[in-house]
């Protein structure tokens, strides 16, 4: 089997480095290039010490030089959108883990997949446990009409609420088919978080955290809490690998890893 050639955009970041380390451990996946705005040297040493790969801030140059099958993107929305446009123009399939896109940007990404006849998966979360958490919250939403979401992340995360929290809320509302019970009014504006059709969403940003979320349902005499905790970025890698392997056989746009898991 011919190895899948992968370029990592955001390669100097923590997620980018974790992706490269994981790719080096896979026989059928081959890291061929690294891109990052902070690139100064023409080559990046691979984390496992097995060699180096072309490294540049110029994405178009790296794509032309390496001709990858897939580009993995873990950056920020402002940097990701131009990169997605460039990769699509080069007919490179995309695995996007960046969050913070506007609805208009997501629509553009979907159109880029169609126009360029490539596969693009955009997933707010690649941790399999987090995907299952959202699925279980959907199930509970059919039976319990009061709920709140608390998401907690490290203090360097720029967007809030998190992409996972927004997907969770949207999935819960879709499963329920109507708004949740309206929470009590707040005396201090925004003290109770952001409301989405009856679901309050609370965002916590603190050093020492990585990525955590809990969905709390309440009813007379009982509560149900569904929680996922990510303690290291290693937990995202099985999902990233699945996405890379599937997207080379997929045309069009896929939103969410749950579609690949067939939940």
From Swiss-Prot:
Residues in coiled coil: none
Organism: Dehalococcoides mccartyi (strain ATCC BAA-2100 / JCM 16839 / KCTC 5957 / BAV1)
Enzyme active site: 153, 157
Family designation: Belongs to the DapB family.
GO biological process: diaminopimelate biosynthetic process; lysine biosynthetic process via diaminopimelate
Binding site for NADP(+): 38
Keywords linked to the UniProt accession: Amino-acid biosynthesis, Cytoplasm, Diaminopimelate biosynthesis, Lysine biosynthesis, NAD, NADP, Oxidoreductase
Record's protein name: 4-hydroxy-tetrahydrodipicolinate reductase
CDD domains in UniProt: DHDPR_N
Cellular location(s): Cytoplasm
GO terms of molecular function: 4-hydroxy-tetrahydrodipicolinate reductase; NAD binding; NADP binding; oxidoreductase activity, acting on CH or CH2 groups, NAD or NADP as acceptor
EC number: 1.17.1.8
HAMAP family: DapB
GO cellular component: cytosol
């Amino acid at each position: 089997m011919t190895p899948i050639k992968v370029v990592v955009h955001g390669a100097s970041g923590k997620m980018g480095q974790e992706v490269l380390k994981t790719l080096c451990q896979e026989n059928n996946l081959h890291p061929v290039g690294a891109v990052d705005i902070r690139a100064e040297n023409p080559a990046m040493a691979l984390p496992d010490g097995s060699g180096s790969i072309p490294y540049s801030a110029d994405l178009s140059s790296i794509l032309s030089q390496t001709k990858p099958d897939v580009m993995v993107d873990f950056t920020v929305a402002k940097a990701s959108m131009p990169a997605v446009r460039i990769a699509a123009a080069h007919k490179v399939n995309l695995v996007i883990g960046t969050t913070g896109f506007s609805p208009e940007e997501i629509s553009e990404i979907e159109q880029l997949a169609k126009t360029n006849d490539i596969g693009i998966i955009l997933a707010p979360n690649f941790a399999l446990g987090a995907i299952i958490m959202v699925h279980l919250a959907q199930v509970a939403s059919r039976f319990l009409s009061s709920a709140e979401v608390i998401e907690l992340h490290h203090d360097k995360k720029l967007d809030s609420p998190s992409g996972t929290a927004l997907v969770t809320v949207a999935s819960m509302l879709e499963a329920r088919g109507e708004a949740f019970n309206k929470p009590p009014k707040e005396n201090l504006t925004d003290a109770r978080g952001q409301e989405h059709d009856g679901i309050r969403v609370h965002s916590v940003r603190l050093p020492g955290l990585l990525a955590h979320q809990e969905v709390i349902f309440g009813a007379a005499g009982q509560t149900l809490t569904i929680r996922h905790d990510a303690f290291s970025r290693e937990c995202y890698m099985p999902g990233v690998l699945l996405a890379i392997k599937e997207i080379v056989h997929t045309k069009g746009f896929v939103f969410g890893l749950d579609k690949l898991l067939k939940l």
